[in-house]
Amino acid sequence: MRAPSTSANLGSGFDVVAVAHDAYFAEAYVKLTSGCGVDIKFRGFDPGGDNTVRRAFQHLFERLGRCWGVEAEVDNRIPIARGLGSSGASAVAALAAFIREAGLRVDPAAVVEAAGLGEAAAAGSPHFDNVAAAALGGAVVIASVKPLELVKFSPRLTFVVGVPDVPPMPEKTKVMRSVLPREVPFRTYVAQLARVSALVAGFARSDPRLVALGMSDEVVEPARAPHVPAYARVRRYALEAGALAVAISGAGPSMIALVEDRDSGAVRAAVERAYAEEGLRAEVKVASTAEGALKDL
């Protein structure tokens, strides 16, 4: 089973919004064995060892009230520590492969919950936005955490994703959360509500113009931008080349630009040039919204 790369937040949707795209993927193969326990082998990028996937299985087994013997092989093609949901997609792909192999019917929210709790092994705390998008595909809103309530949309959107080749930031999630403001002015709060409303409305209508309005952010992104390599230049060059909006992908350092199809080539070239002028190597891809790992289950 295959799970797509994801980009969380998208500007104003901090911790509640993520989109699945086909820039990269993680794929998993599972064989059931006798006994109880999970044996995991990784190929490609290893997102923090097998703890993420192993814990995801443990949480799912607890939810189902039974333990299985599982041999899982995960082929992760999503660069790690780049804000692209690598660990979450690996866990989702493995759980989806297990569910198919075991012939089970499982509530998608239970899969997302198990994978999100498993991701705490890599991120330090549960994150449901990335794993929800990897599982369900399209664009996902976390409407509630307790109980976990997910809302999926299926917009047709095109992105340019820039992935700089930089050393991973130690304790990235902790650092990028530590810089967030503890208080915001009331007017900023109201403006942020308007933006995230536009973001969700844009998903519902598959309207890039509304999504672009929602990708503007005055709270989280300004605080994180100084910690994202080439942020200002990438953003400026992408917008000048025709991008509708630009945001940090997850906690970075990758960036994601929303584009019209006709402008994707020009924006991709502009982002490549921006990284090069900053002295950075980067992989820049044109991507579209993708289906999730649970689509056939």
Swiss-Prot record:
It catalyses: L-homoserine + ATP = O-phospho-L-homoserine + ADP + H(+). It holds the Pfam family GHMP_kinases_C. It is found in: Cytoplasm. One of its GO terms (molecular function) is ATP binding. Keywords: Amino-acid biosynthesis, ATP-binding, Cytoplasm, Kinase, Nucleotide-binding, Threonine biosynthesis, Transferase. Pathway: Amino-acid biosynthesis; L-threonine biosynthesis; L-threonine from L-aspartate: step 4/5. It comes from the Archaea. Its main location: cytoplasm. GO terms for biological process: threonine biosynthetic process. Signal peptide: none annotated. Catalyzes the ATP-dependent phosphorylation of L-homoserine to L-homoserine phosphate. HAMAP family: Homoser_kinase (MF_00384). This is Homoserine kinase.
